[in-house]
Amino acid sequence: MIVSRQVIRSVVRKSFNRLCSANVVALPSGSTKEALKELRRKTGYSYVNCRKALNEFGPDNLDEAIKWLKKRAIEEGWEKAAKLGDRPTRQGIVSVMTKGNKAAIVELNCETDFVSRNEDFKRLVEDVTKAVLHAADRDGTSTHGFELLNSNINSLKTSENGMLVKDLITEAIGRLGENITLSRAQLILAPPNVQLFGYAHPKEGTDRVYMGRYVSVVGLKGSNKTDFPTEKLGFQLCQHVVGMRSLTLGTPLPVKKTSVKDEVSQDDEINAFYNGEVTHIDENETQLLRQSFMLNPSQTVHEYVTGHGASIVDFYRTELSSNVSEESFQS
C-alpha cells in the first residue's frame, strides 16, 4: 500500500500539534497571578513551588497551599540538611530578648557571614528567641540572683503557631542552602522584684529582639531617687558589660579616708586643707561593681548605680561561639 507524502505530512503535523498542546502550561489568569504574588509574599518560596501549590489547591484556597508549601519545604530541608550536616557553622548571630524578670538568649549559627546578615535568617533568629522566652512563662522564677536554664531545643515550639523550632530551622536550611545549627537556647530567670535589661553589639535585630556578636543582660532592682529613667540606666549598664568585658559582679570598692596632702608633692600646698574620701580605681579590674563606669570614668559602676537609687542583682555576658557545644538537628 502506497501512502502519499501529503497524507504522511498531515498525520505528522496533527501528532506534533497534539504533543505540543499536551505540554503547554496555560498562562495564569488575573486571579491566579494575584494569588501567586500573595503566596510568594507570605511564604518567600520559589515561583515554581508556589505555582505547584496553586495548581494543587487553586487560587481561592491559599491557606491549604501555604500548609502544603511548608510541609514540602520541611521535607526538602531535611533532605538538604542530611547533605549539609557535616559542614562547619562558624558564623551566626547571638540574640537577647527580655520581659520583666525573664530573658532569652539564643545563638544560631550558619556557614557564612553573608547568610547571617540575611533578613530571612534574622527573622528565624527572632522566632527562635521568642520561642525561648515564651517557654520561660512556664518555668517560674528564681528566688535569688540569676538562674540560667538551657531550653530543651528538641521540644521547643514557636509562640505563634506551635511549630517545632527544629522544623523551622530545617525549613530555613532548605530555603537558604546552608547548614544551620542552634547552639544556644538559654533562659535567665530573676526574682520577681528584679527587672532585666538586654543589649547586643553591634546593634542589629528588631525593636524587641537585639542581635549581634556580643550580648549582655543586667538585672536591676530599687526605685530611682532621681528622674533618670530605669530603662536608660539598664541599657547603659548593659553597654558597659559588653564594652568593659566584666567577668564577675564582685563587691564595691572600700572607700578610704585620705589626706590629699599625703598624695602630692611637698611643694603643692594648694590642696593641703582637704581631708576627704577617695576611691582608688584599678583600670584592669574585672569585677563589675569595682570597674570605672564607661560613661563616667570618675565613678565606679557601684557609685553610679547607687547614685540613681538602684542596685545590680546580677549580670550575664556572652559572645558568638563562646563556651557552648554546637548541637545540630541533622542526623
Swiss-Prot record:
Chief location bin: mitochondrion
Protein name from the UniProt record: Elongation factor Ts, mitochondrial
CC terms in the record's Gene Ontology section: mitochondrion
UniProt keyword list: Elongation factor, Mitochondrion, Protein biosynthesis, Transit peptide
Lineage top rank: taxon: Eukaryota
Family to which the UniProt record says this protein belongs: Belongs to the EF-Ts family.
GO biological process, one term: mitochondrial translational elongation
Record localization: Mitochondrion
Role this protein plays: Associates with the EF-Tu.GDP complex and induces the exchange of GDP to GTP. It remains bound to the aminoacyl-tRNA.EF-Tu.GTP complex up to the GTP hydrolysis stage on the ribosome.
CDD domains to which the protein is assigned, alphabetical: UBA_EF-Ts
Example GO molecular function: translation elongation factor activity
Transit peptide residues according to the UniProt entry: 1-14
